[in-house]
Amino acid sequence: MASTRAKPTLPLLLALVTVVIPGPGDAQVSIHPREAFLPQGGSVQVNCSSSCKEDLSLGLETQWLKDELESGPNWKLFELSEIGEDSSPLCFENCGTVQSSASATITVYSFPESVELRPLPAWQQVGKDLTLRCHVDGGAPRTQLSAVLLRGEEILSRQPVGGHPKDPKEITFTVLASRGDHGANFSCRTELDLRPQGLALFSNVSEARSLRTFDLPATIPKLDTPDLLEVGTQQKLFCSLEGLFPASEARIYLELGGQMPTQESTNSSDSVSATALVEVTEEFDRTLPLRCVLELADQILETQRTLTVYNFSAPVLTLSQLEVSEGSQVTVKCEAHSGSKVVLLSGVEPRPPTPQVQFTLNASSEDHKRSFFCSAALEVAGKFLFKNQTLELHVLYGPRLDETDCLGNWTWQEGSQQTLKCQAWGNPSPKMTCRRKADGALLPIGVVKSVKQEMNGTYVCHAFSSHGNVTRNVYLTVLYHSQNNWTIIILVPVLLVIVGLVMAASYVYNRQRKIRIYKLQKAQEEAIKLKGQAPPP
């Protein structure tokens, strides 16, 4: 306990008050001082005096040790020592047959023997009430003693201690714990205020106690891992929880089948996670319990799940031969293992699942690079799992040189740009030559920038490989311009001009003839009209 205490210099005689009690000859008894204020265990001198004129017997009644220091005919001076608590010493006299007395008030002050903040809980949940308990032992006068509860330097509560100094007192105060209280120091301080008596304010402070708070979400840790584990694979097990505090104090771990696999945990500001990589082997039980456990403060949050371990081999897809010549027979077979069944084999009509499916085909050129697909299914824990296998067939066949691969007739205009396509195909890829029958000139396959008359002719294309050969004729016709053609080209426009002129002249002639006929008819009509109007002779 840390404490501060001053040694006060207190006047032992503070006041003089006389108590008068009538007696023979108006005798009076008095006590001095009437009030005294001193530290516990201290001493004070008390004077008892009387105005009695007759036979006088004077004394002091007290519970403390007393020594008579001096005396006179009608007074005595006593010293009281080791005064432990508040008391009222009494001066008394026997004056003749009359008794009288006077009392004083002694007030004792003392510092608390101990000030202690009761131990705090190991962990306090955020949002819950935290009761601080300050235990005060001793201290007087209690009317001037108070207890202060602190969070760091912040005053949370100040309360009077009260009660009898000999009785220990507990002062309580309730606060609502928050995240900000994590790591905060709480303490209790007593304050003995003797300033009204001309002294100072004396304080004792308890040892500080540190508080740890925690907060947990309403959810449980989240497991992110498949329910099914396949033998021969590596599976990632992951568990996490968000919204907790303080995440740095939390511990999270994974437990698989009662064993803790090698794992790595991560703590961030308000979340934690655990990750484990597990090699699934045949030694594993078919069902394994998986637990994710989070520990924070005195709380444990847990998530459980049951994992199923299975062994599922891919189906075995075989071809009797991966490479065959055209026309050969090929057997395609798919076999399932580990309790699985074949549900699909390309080339076979759908049928009920069975452990094995096969069929035979005659290989043709269309089957070259044909993919065969096989799928097997396995039911595990009510779920259907699928695995597939694919194989490719290679068929050897002779060269092909059809109309679509190489046109038989080509007609080009001399001087134009053309592209000639002629390509044989087969497996293995055939070689091909195209030569003109007349002189063996090569067929211009590809891009021809300027067609020439000399390219005209009949060409023979021959494609061959280790699996056969094929021949195809290609006719190339080149249209070109001769000198007679130029004469025709010149004469045609001239003739067209002459014909046009003749037609124009005929049109003008016919028009003039029609006009003359029209005028003649008009003249005849006018003559007949005049003749009808003449008077008879």
Swiss-Prot record:
Residues 41-102, 127-195, 232-299, 327-381, 415-468 form the Ig-like C2-type domain. Gene3D superfamilies: Immunoglobulins (2.60.40.10). The chain crosses the membrane at residues 486-509. Monoubiquitinated, which is promoted by MARCH9 and leads to endocytosis. Coiled coil: none annotated. Residues 510-537 are cytoplasmic. Residues 1-27 form the signal peptide. Expressed at low level on a subpopulation of lymphocytes, macrophages, and endothelial cells, but is strongly induced on these cells, and on fibroblasts and epithelial cells. GO terms for molecular function: integrin binding. It is found in: Membrane. Belongs to the immunoglobulin superfamily. ICAM family. ICAM proteins are ligands for the leukocyte adhesion protein LFA-1 (integrin alpha-L/beta-2). During leukocyte trans-endothelial migration, ICAM1 engagement promotes the assembly of endothelial apical cups through ARHGEF26/SGEF and RHOG activation. This is Intercellular adhesion molecule 1. The gene is Icam1.
